[in-house]
Amino acid sequence: MSQENLDLVRTRLNIVVEAFNARGVDAALPHIHPELVWNAPPEWLESDVYRGREGLRELATSWGQNFDEYRLDLERVVDLGDGRAVALVHQRGRLKGTGHPMEMAVGWIVELVDGQVARVDVYFSWEAALDAAGLSE
C-alpha cells in the first residue's frame, strides 16, 4: 500500500471513530460497508461474528450497555498492503452504575472496500493483531 493509501485508511478510520464518539454508532454507519464482517476475538462472550451495518449496531448496543461513558481513540495504523492495515485502538469508558474507569488497548486488522470499512478482525492486544497479520514489533 502506498503512503497515499495508508493515509486513506487512517483517514477513514478516524472518520468512523470520530463519528462514533460524537454521535454514536448510527453516525458511523454511512462509512461502514453494507457487507461488513466484524470478527470479535475468540475470547468474546457474545456472538463472534457481526455482519453488516445492523450487526455493527447490535454489537455497539450490546457492548455499550455496560458503560455510562465510552469512547474509542485511534492511536496507530500500520500498512499491510492490499487495502488492509492494523490499527491500535484504545477503548475508554466508565462502567455503568459504578463510575469505575475502564481502559483497554485492542488491535484491529481492517480492510477497506470502496473507501468503506468492510472487515474488522479484533484482537485483545496490539501484539496479537500484529502477530495475526504476520508482523511483530
Task: Give residue ranges: language-model regions.
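Short, surface-exposed coil-to-beta transition loops
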Residues: R71-D73, P101-W108
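A short hydrophobic beta-strand element
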Residues: G81-Q91
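A solvent-exposed, acidic/Ser-Thr-rich amphipathic alpha-helical stretch
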Residues: N5, T11, V25-G83
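Short beta-strand segments enriched in hydrophobic/aromatic residues
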Residues: I32, Q91-G93, W108, F124
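Short, cysteine-centered beta-strand-loop-beta hairpins and adjacent loop/turn segments enriched
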Residues: N66, G93-E103
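Short beta-strand edge/turn micro-motifs at domain boundaries
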Residues: R84, A105-D131
